[in-house]
């Protein structure tokens, strides 16, 4: 399961001068869609106890807190890809690094990922990982039925859903409608802090520094900004004729007519 530690967007603010995110003092959380992806994997484990659930992330050393949350939910192993060489990565470079980590884990039947991360909203990393690994991908998954060697899923569409059968190994990106992530028990939280988290740098996953991080990122963020607030709405009262007259006056004031 590919997971990501993200800033809580309810607390995020933009530096008005530099146009960048102010991350200092902002709490970090497990990306919500990734929690649904992890729950999907854990439910497969609930049905078949021989299933091993592994969580993988790329990030700073502090991401171990998020990984321990995943372990407390029920994941068996956790891997952190952490290296200064990975810094400044766009989705292209991020997918390269995560794919390298997945190859290092090896013997993976299904890769789960959230539909998108709330700090980027691109929904690109999951499909890019699948492309780099040469496996099929199904996005916007809202239901999963697993059989021998294949998986049948419902793929969320704007006007309904699409039923897709896909062979394993494959990658599925999950939406929040798929499930309700489970809570962590006190016992599992204690166990999670007793488990080892494996940390890999670029050498451990056989990546050249020029092929990851900022060096391998064809896209870069030019500026982040908060859209200007829209004007407040105003309720008009009176008869139809009076309201029509007031509306015309308001539109004239704004030079809209």
Give the predicted meaning of each segment.
Residues 2-257:
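N-terminal glycine-rich FAD/FM-binding segment characteristic of electron-transfer flavoproteins
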């Amino acid at each position: 399961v590919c997971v990501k530690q993200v800033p809580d967007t309810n607390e995020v603010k933009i530096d008005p001068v530099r146009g960048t995110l102010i991350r200092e003092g902002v709490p970090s959380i497990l990306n919500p869609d990734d929690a649904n992806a992890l729950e999907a994997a854990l439910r497969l484990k609930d049905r078949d106890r021989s299933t091993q659930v592994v969580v993988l992330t790329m990030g700073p050393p502090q991401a171990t807190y998020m990984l321990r949350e995943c372990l407390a939910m029920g994941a068996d192993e956790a891997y952190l890809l952490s290296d200064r060489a990975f810094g400044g990565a766009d989705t292209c470079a991020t997918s390269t690094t995560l794919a390298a980590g997945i190859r290092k884990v090896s013997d993976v039947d299904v890769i789960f990922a959230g539909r998108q991360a709330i700090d980027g909203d691109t929904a690109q990393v999951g499909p890019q990982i699948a492309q780099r690994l040469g496996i099929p991908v199904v996005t916007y998954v809202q239901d999963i039925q697993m059989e021998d060697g294949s998986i049948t899923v419902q793929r969320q569409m704007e006007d309904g859903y699409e039923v897709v059968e896909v062979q394993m190994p494959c990658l599925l990106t999950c939406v929040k409608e798929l499930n309700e992530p489970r809570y962590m028990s006190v016992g599992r939280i204690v166990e999670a802090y007793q488990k080892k988290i494996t940390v890999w740098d670029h050498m451990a996953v056989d990546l050249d520094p020029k092929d990851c991080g900022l060096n391998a990122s064809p896209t870069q963020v030019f500026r982040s900004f908060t859209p200007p607030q829209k004007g407040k709405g105003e309720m008009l009262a009176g008869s139809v004729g009076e309201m029509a007259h007031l509306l015309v006056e308001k539109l004239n004031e704004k030079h809209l007519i």
